[in-house]
Curated annotation (Swiss-Prot):
PROSITE patterns: A_DEAMIN_EDITASE. It holds the Pfam family A_deamin. It comes from Gallus gallus (Chicken). This is tRNA-specific adenosine deaminase 1. Its EC number is 3.5.4.34. It comes from the Eukaryota. Specifically deaminates adenosine-37 to inosine in tRNA-Ala. InterPro entries: A_deamin (IPR002466). It is an enzyme of class 3 (hydrolase). The keyword tRNA processing applies. Zn(2+) binds at H87, C142, C300.
Length: 503
C-alpha cells in the first residue's frame, strides 16, 4: 500500500538527506521546485499489487530534479551540450532516462538486478510486471494544468473544487477523487519580485479573496461582471460558465482563476486576456516563458501529456524496448490544484488518439495530490519569512540525481555544469550528465557493448551516425509521435534538425 503523502515524504526525505547543499536554494531569499520518479516494486509473484495498493511494496526514489529555469532560443546550441529546459519535471524525467539507460546496460549484461526482462523480439526488453513508476512534482505543472478555477464560500479561503477543506486529507493510490487545493502557492516567472504583497480584498458577497501582481507564472485573477465574453476564442467560455455555477456542497462559485505564465504557441488559438475567469483559454499548447528571449520549450503540462502517450524513455531507448515505460501515477504536492485541470491537461487532450503502433496507448494515469508541502517551495519560504521584506527569487541552479553507480549528482546553472565559465563552455567538463549529447554517448556505449546479432532490427538495418539518425530510426516511436502531433498536439514546437545533427 502507498499513499500520495507517503510518496511525497519519500521524495522530500531523499532531497533532505541524500543531496548536499550544492544547488539548493538559500532559504532566506530563494525557492525552487522539485520533481522525482519513484519505483514501486511488489513481490515478484504479486504482479499488479503495486498498482492496487493492497500489499506491502518497496518504494525507492530512482530519479530527482529541481529547477525553475529555461533558456531562450539565442542560447540553444547545435552541439547538444546545453540543457534547454531546467524545470524540475524535465530534469527529473531526463534523470530518469539516465537511470533507464543504466538498467538497460544491466539487462543486456544479463544481470538479474535489472528492472528489465527479455521481450519476445530479438534485442527487445520489457519492464518487469511487478514494477511501476510514480511521478511526483511539488507544484502543479506549468501550462494548462495550472489554469485552475478559484472557488470560495463566504469568508473562507483555500477551499478545494469539491468543497472540502485541505487539512487532514490523505489519498490512497487507488483513489480517483483527489481534488485538493493548498492556500496561495503559485509559481512565479523569472521576473517576479516576491516582495509584492498579497492583499486580501472583499468581494460583493462579503467573502475574501487574494490578489497579486501580474508577473507571476501562476497567478490568481478574479471574476468581473458578466458580459464581454468572446465565445469564439475556444471552449473556455462554456467551461468557465459551468465552473461558475454554485455547487450543492457548500455553494462554491468560481470567483477567479489561477493564471499560468506559459505563453500560447504562435499561430494557435490565443488567450482572451479578459480580466477574470475568462482570461485564459484551456486545453492549449503553451511554451515556457523566458527572460526577454522567447523559449522553444513546451510547458510541463504539455510534456506530461506527451509522456502519457509515448512513455518516458524517449526515442533512443525505444530501440531496445518492446513497450514504452509509462507512469502509473502523477502526484502533486500541496499547492493550488484542480483534479479537473490535471485530467484535462494530462489525459483528456490525447484520449481520442487512434492508429497508434502496437504497445502505445493514452494511459489512464492516476492523478493525485498530497497534503505535504515542499520545504523550499515559494510558499513555504514565504511563510517562513513573514517578518522579512527581503525579495524572494527562484534559485538559479538545477539539481539532477539518478540512481546510478557513477556520478549520480549533477548540478547545473543556465544549462551548464555549475561553475562553468564562459571560456569553459563547450568543453566536456561543462556538460550536464543529462544533456542530449551526454545521454546520446551513454546510449552509444550501450549499443557498442552488444554483439550485432543481438541488436534489435532498427539498429542493424543501416548505418546510423548522428543523434538525429538514431532518433528517426526508432520507427514505432516516430510513428506514434507523428500520430500524436497530427491528432492532438498540432502546434507542438519541434527543434530544428540542425540542433540534432551532433555525434
Amino acid at each position: 500500500m502507498w499513499t500520495a503523502d507517503e510518496i511525497a515524504e519519500l521524495c522530500y526525505e531523499h532531497y533532505r538527506s541524500r543531496l548536499p547543499k550544492q544547488g539548493k536554494p538559500d532559504p532566506s531569499r530563494e525557492w525552487t521546485s522539485l520533481a522525482a520518479v519513484v519505483k514501486v516494486e511488489s513481490a515478484a509473484n504479486e504482479a499488479g499489487s503495486a498498482v492496487l495498493g493492497t500489499l506491502q511494496v518497496a518504494k525507492e526514489v530512482v530519479a530527482l530534479g529541481t529547477g525553475t529555469k529555461c533558456i531562450g532560443l539565442n542560447k540553444m546550441r547545435k552541439t547538444g551540450d546545453v540543457l534547454n529546459d531546467s524545470h524540475a519535471e524535465v530534469v527529473a524525467k531526463r534523470s530518469f532516462q539516465r537511470y533507464l539507460l543504466h538498467q538497460m546496460r544491466l539487462a543486456t549484461s544479463y544481470q538479474q538486478c535489472s528492472i528489465f526482462i527479455p521481450g519476445t523480439e530479438t534485442g527487445k526488453w520489457k519492464l518487469k510486471p511487478n514494477i511501476i513508476f510514480i511521478f511526483f512534482c511539488s507544484h502543479t505543472p506549468c501550462g494548462d494544468a495550472s489554469i485552475i478555477p478559484i472557488r470560495e464560500t463566504e469568508n473562507h479561503l483555500s477551499k478545494s473544487v469539491d468543497g472540502h477543506d485541505i487539512a487532514g486529507q490523505s489519498v490512497l493510490c487507488s483513489s480517483s477523487n483527489c481534488d485538493h487545493r493548498g492556500p496561495e502557492d503559485k509559481r512565479k516567472s523569472e521576473k517576479m519580485a516576491s516582495s509584492h504583497m498579497i492583499k486580501r480584498m472583499k468581494n460583493a458577497d462579503g467573502g475574501f479573496f487574494s490578489t497579486i501582481t501580474e508577473d507571476m507564472a501562476v497567478q490568481q485573477v478574479f471574476a468581473k461582471p458578466e458580459g464581454n465574453v468572446n465565445p469564439e476564442c475556444c471552449e473556455s467560455s462554456e467551461e468557465m460558465q459551468a465552473a461558475n455555477k454554485e455547487t450543492n456542497a457548500g455553494k462554491l462559485k468560481a470567483v477567479g482563476v489561477y493564471r499560468t505564465g506559459a505563453k500560447f504557441v504562435p499561430g494557435e488559438l490565443s488567450d482572451t486576456l479578459i480580466p477574470g475567469i475568462e482570461y485564459h483559454c484551456v486545453g492549449l499548447l503553451r511554451v515556457k516563458p523566458g527572460r526577454g528571449d522567447r523559449t522553444c520549450s513546451m510547458s510541463c503540462s504539455d510534456k506530461l501529456a506527451r509522456w502519457n502517450v509515448l512513455g518516458c524513455q524517449g526515442a533512443l531507448l525505444m530501440h531496445f524496448l518492446q513497450y514504452p515505460v509509462y507512469l502509473s501515477a502523477v502526484i502533486v504536492g500541496k499547492c493550488p490544484y484542480s483534479q479537473e485541470a490535471m485530467q484535462r491537461a494530462v489525459i483528456e487532450r490525447c484520449r481520442h488518439i487512434s492508429l497508434l503502433p502496437d504497445g502505445f496507448l493514452t494511459q489512464e494515469v492516476q492523478l493525485l495530490q498530497s497534503d505535504l508541502q515542499f520545504e523550499h517551495s515559494r510558499q513555504a519560504i514565504q511563510e517562513g519569512q513573514t517578518s522579512s521584506k527581503r525579495k524572494l527569487v527562484p534559485c538559479s541552479a538545477a539539481i539532477s540525481w539518478s540512481a546510478v553507480p557513477e556520478g549520480p549528482l549533477d548540478v547545473t546553472s543556465d544549462g551548464f555544469r555549475q561553475g562553468t565559465t564562459k571560456k569553459g563552455i563547450g568543453s566536456p567538463q561543462s556538460r550536464s550528465k543529462i544533456c542530449k549529447v551526454e545521454l546520446f554517448h551513454e546510449f552509444q556505449k550501450l549499443v557498442t557493448s552488444i554483439s550485432k546479432e543481438n541488436l534489435p532490427d532498427t539498429l542493424r538495418m543501416k548505418t546510423l551516425e548522428t543523434y538525429w539518425d538514431y532518433k528517426e530510426a526508432a520507427l514505432n516511436y516516430q510513428e506514434a509521435w507523428k500520430a500524436l502531433r497530427s491528432q492532438a498536439l498540432l502546434g507542438w514546437i519541434k527543434n530544428a534538425q540542425e540542433y540534432l545533427l551532433f555525434m
